[in-house]
Amino acid sequence: MVSVIDKLVFDFGGKTLVSLAPDNNTLCVANKNGLTKILKTNNPEEEPETLDSSKLVSSIKCYSNSHFLMTTMQGDALRYNIDSSQEELLARFALPLRDCCVIHSGKMAVFGGDDLELILLELDDETHKKHAIKIDEQVSQISYNSQMNILAVSMINGKVQIFSLTSTIPNKVHELNDYIVANSYDDTHRDKILSNMMDDIDKDNDNDLSETADPDENNVADPEFCAANRICTRVAWHPKGLHFALPCADDTVKIFSIKGYSLQKTLSTNLSSTKAHFIDLQFDPLRGTYIAAVDLNNKLTVWNWETSEIHYTREFKRKITNIAWKIQADSKTLDLVLGTWSGSIAIVQNLAESVVSNIPDQSVAESSTKHGLFVDSESDLENLEGNDDINKSDKLFSDITQEANAEDVFTQTHDGPSGLSEKRKYNFEDEEDFIDDDDGAGYISGKKPHNEHSYSRVHKTHSFPISLANTGKFRYMPFSPAGTPFGFTDRRYLTMNEVGYVSTVKNSEQYSITVSFFDVGRFREYHFEDLFGYDLCFLNEKGTLFGQSKTGQIQYRPHDSIHSNWTKIIPLQAGERITSVAATPVRVIVGTSLGYFRSFNQFGVPFAVEKTSPIVALTAQNYRVFSVHYSQFHGLSYSLSELGTSSKRYYKRECPLPMSLPNINSDMKKDANLDYYNFNPMGIKSLFFSSYGDPCIFGSDNTLLLLSKWRSPEESKWLPILDSNMEIWKMSGGKETTDIHVWPLALAYDTLNCILVKGKHIWPEFPLPLPSEMEIRMPVFVKSKLLEENKAILNKKNEIGADTEAEEGEEDKEIQIPVSMAAEEEYLRSKVLSELLTDTLENDGEMYGNENEVLAALNGAYDKALLRLFASACSDQNVEKALSLAHELKQDRALTAAVKISERAELPSLVKKINNIREARYEQQLK
């Protein structure tokens, strides 16, 4: 039964705001007179803690059980530690701040106000690094969708701007106009002269607030109290992240879908009552079935928004400031806490009981009804967590035949109580091995015994090296290029490349997927609800392919709305699973753990099926497919083929791949990256085709390998064209760093597009840093030699009396490569790049229209590097070495330059021999 409890918190009254901590027990109650009290809602008799806080509070956000943020009309952004009662000034601004929220799992905070910019502060950073985003109008209120990583900014001109926060720099993706109230804050109360004038003119301007109630409780003497300072424009987000609500200017609540930002339905209060603008609006945090709103008449209305029915309504005598939902200890009963302008709070107890949310989403409902493939990814930790002797790394190995006796994955109920067809329901009680913990990061809960707590996520580990001796029990895991594990978060990247990245967020019932792009001018980010637990993904410029490794379902979703998406079920044998998928605008490819290689056209029509060695990774470009295999007999191998319109051509078929599996030894027992190798036992971070169509692979050794001359089987070879560990070492000034990592995206000519990851994990987390570029460098340098050369340079500077402070700064700068060593590397790099480009031109012709100019520039760089080496040999009077280098020069003008260098070095015999080379080449050209 619903009951209302009034609790006086501040005897002196005043504007009082409430915010509830994630534990649903710690309630922060802030008063504008400079006090904040911490109440324990589960122990109402307990004496509350009292903190001295800032006056003129404008918003409060309790984002953890021990910290909350506060903004003030004086422009202060503050953070408070509940445990230590410590206040921390994060930033100060000239104009008032109006609202705040916390993003990226508490790593950053967003503040908005009258300064015409959004301020992002890094909370984890001691200096609280600030990022400012210019906006067109003053901020009214802000809110954050943690599931989809979206920030909604309401402005005083009535516009709502939606920003994607999936990358470091927020990206505006949509704008809603003419829905919310265009409302400017009334700050005349802050000016004493203006405030007195307004009091003398008319004390009854706020006739919107009149109501028949006790005058002692109804009248608020605070000059800040007026309709303009109470109206809510904040976007309310559904806990699943796929819907949001707006408090609209027509005094209705409008529900929108994040898919296309389309209006789903409109909720209104009782038509017989006096309508008024809303002062707060919130979805219930449990399942999002209910939405609560309070209007300027202090009338609380709670809707079941899915049925559009009013669940509860009540009009309060006290003036309400804001509201906060509370989940009771039984995890199903909901209370509502309301702040007031009189120093008290009201608690509406037993307001509602959570029911299973059945959010209407046509595309999801249709797909679910057709295929009934919802996958609950909570199955594989029962053995891991229930047995202390089992190691995390053991999850890499499992006899695949154990999966052969799996029971049916679900039961289907077609008819509901009403006799109408309903969405299928699934029973997972007996299906503990339905889906594996595919990232090995411990995010799947084991089957919970009745009346017992869930298992702890902390388990013992012991070493288990990966070698050919263990391949009999090797577990094939789903792989997507540059995919990341969940780790200990609720989100991960399914895949990423030069086009963009696909992320998924898991909640209690399903996953939510976001497809984001680096080129925001060309593509538009989109979201959808994933009921099937997709764990495979491939992104291209036209669309995205998703796959579920255990059920065999694949789905292709074009980026535009012109072409329709399609879904297909891949037949799987007992114990077989899809291990990798790839898609181009013309072909879709699926590989499995038993070696089935299936190809389809862009509309899902089967093109071919083939049996190979077990496939562990795939990528594709146009009609070409690069696949990696792994078997206990042959280790790692690769295939390169072209799927023509009428036939398939193999360039390479299951040839040895010069890579080894990562060795998980005792040293990695406590390694923070053990989760990654559980998730990806191959250690392949990504594989892709270069911009000129050459296969590339980036493994656990952080070296980029490129397949050269692959069109000629006798000449093909793997070339190490970049050792990223060496490049990081050079950029760090010769220091061995363990907190900077390279995450590959693509190879564009001679530049690796990548994400520079900072931190203990080798994979990128949220938000995604901006892509960086790293020029390829052939691995020819020796660290000890480079350090010796740089030390010698510093010693020379000391001899000539260089500034000591400047010298200390030099030590932190990038390692300088001596001229002779740099020339050797440039010579080799130019040679490799020119060979690759020549091979492309001879077989595929020009792809971008400037290949011949690029090739000429490469030949010039090649000869210049050789001439530097030639000059060094001449200065050392090493005629034989100089002559060998002269033979490698390509252009006649380079030979002419070599002659001049030889003359300057007074080596007449070398001059004569080089002239003979020139004459021989000239005669050969005449033939």
UniProtKB/Swiss-Prot annotation:
Protein name from the UniProt record: DNA polymerase alpha-binding protein
Subcellular location(s) per record: Nucleus
Described function: Accessory factor for DNA replication. It plays a role in accurately duplicating the genome in vivo.
Record-linked PANTHER family: WD REPEAT AND HMG-BOX DNA BINDING PROTEIN, WD REPEAT AND HMG-BOX DNA-BINDING PROTEIN 1
Principal location listed in the UniProt entry: nucleus
GO molecular function term, any single one: chromatin binding
Claim: Repeat is one of the keywords in the record: yes
Pfam families: Ctf4_C, Mcl1_mid
